[in-house]
Regions:
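A short, structured beta-strand/loop element
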Residues: 24-40
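The AdoMet/dcAdoMet-binding core of the Class I SAM-like
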Residues: 9, 24, 43-167, 211-214
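Conserved beta-strand signature within the Rossmann-like core of class I S-adenosyl-L-methionine
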Residues: 172-179
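Conserved Class I S-adenosyl-L-methionine
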Residues: 162-163, 187-208
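SAM/dcSAM-binding transferase cores
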Residues: 1-20, 37-43, 62, 212-281
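Charged, long alpha-helical assembly modules
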Residues: 179-183, 199, 208, 212-216, ...
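A generic structural signal for alpha->beta connector loops
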Residues: 92-94, 117-119, 172, 199-201, ...
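Conserved class I S-adenosyl-L-methionine
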Residues: 153, 179-194
Length: 281
């Protein structure tokens, strides 16, 4: 059998590279400008390699009863790791993936195709523009994993954006976002304050070392109108190979502190990761 070889291509927003994993036969790492974007195992779509993807997976597994199909809107495509995961764990789900980088979409379609019958539809569009024109109450889950380079774009951080996401969700729907920050957490705290203006229930999933300010890292924001079973989620995330905590309620309000919600005119991207925090090959 031919050894898989790396693929490098200039896409709309940088240089994308697909690198085969030497340890797993049909698994690939996608980087854009050396920042890891996605890891996907074509033979085992339920395998989630990255810490933040595993945490998003735990939420997806616990938010409604296992196996029930969901309508999911993914903002940010990457190599479609989470759409493949949902298709495998919740067959019959209808999923839309919105990715602004058309070149990246083409690369993934060509080298890491999704089965025709997986119920996954790809759209080349800006995430916020798509949200603002989408049908109201059309999604059970919205997952935002959008990084321009290694930063969350400013226009996806404001109260207007949070309202747009809430409008697309059904009443019992759940919004999830992959964010990144370091102490003193100005960005993360402002994001929590922003989503608190729209959603009654908030949780944050992060590694204790990140929350204690030891290093830069990812945090998953979970927002909904209905209370979620954070105890089940906390057990799942604590038992993971990369243990994490679930903060909610009073502890989370204390973490938010005096942070103010973000208005469109004041919005800034998430902070630049320190050199080497996310870079690879």
């Amino acid at each position: 059998v031919d050894e898989p070889i790396p693929v490098t291509r200039t896409v709309d927003h940088g240089t994308a590279k697909l690198m085969p994993d030497v340890d797993r036969e049909r698994a690939w790492l996608l980087t854009v400008d050396a920042a890891p974007q996605s890891y996907v195992d074509l033979d085992e779509p339920t395998h989630l390699e990255f810490e933040y993807a595993r945490r998003l997976g735990h939420v997806l597994d616990t938010v409604v009863e296992p196996g029930r199909p969901l309508d999911v809107l993914h903002l940010g495509g990457g190599a479609l790791t989470l759409p493949r995961y949902v298709a495998a764990t919740r067959p019959g789900s209808r999923q839309d993936v919105v990715e602004v980088d058309l070149g990246l979409l083409d690369l993934v379609r060509e080298h890491l195709p999704v089965p025709e019958d997986a119920g996954i539809t790809l759209h080349g569009a800006d995430a916020r523009g798509w949200l603002e024109s989408a049908a109201p109450a059309s999604a059970d889950i919205v997952i935002a994993d959008v990084f321009g380079g290694a930063r969350v774009p400013a226009h996806l951080t404001s109260t207007a954006y949070a309202r747009a996401a809430a409008r697309v969700l059904r009443e019992d729907g759940v919004y999830l976002a992959n964010l990144a920050d370091a102490a003193p957490f100005a960005f993360l705290r402002s994001q929590l304050a922003t989503f608190a203006t729209v959603f009654e229930e908030l949780s944050l999933i992060a590694e204790p070392g990140v929350l204690r300010g030891r290093r830069f890292g990812n945090a998953v924001l979970v927002a909904s109108h209905r209370p979620l079973d954070t105890a089940v989620l906390a057990r799942r995330t604590a038992a993971d190979a990369f243990p994490a905590r679930v903060e909610s309620g009073a502890a989370l309000r204390e973490f938010i502190g005096s942070a103010a919600p973000v208005r469109d005119e004041d919005a800034v991207p998430s902070p630049e990761p320190p050199g080497g925090a996310f870079s690879i090959g």
